[in-house]
């Protein structure tokens, strides 16, 4: 094998490696993920280097049929993990519906919810067993509705 052939082979190999690594970092449409035994998996593709069939780790997103973003967040080993944001679908606008964190598929820490008009609706914390501590609920006109201790 000549020097030129080895050089071309090395470049092709590096490109394949780069494409394989980069594809794991790019956000994926969550509707393309496959749910199996409570975990989200990458769809099986013909290109083995993409990590097809593995529990998904990375950023994912969903869109409503209208094209408005529905959700965006990260998965770790097939479970929601990290920051997630959900949106309302309001007349083609993307109004935030809720923001919070997941740990191994469970909501944890501070979560904030908003009405479709953009006003805050509820604020509180989650632990793996559900809502905990003080939760504050608001009316759409910003007035306090109720405070509940869970």
Where are these regions (language model features)?
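Bacterial N-terminal signal peptides that target proteins for export
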Residues: 2-9
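Bacterial N-terminal signal peptides
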Residues: 10-19
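Glycine/tyrosine- and acidic-biased, solvent-exposed loop/turn segments at the edges of beta-strands
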Residues: 19-150
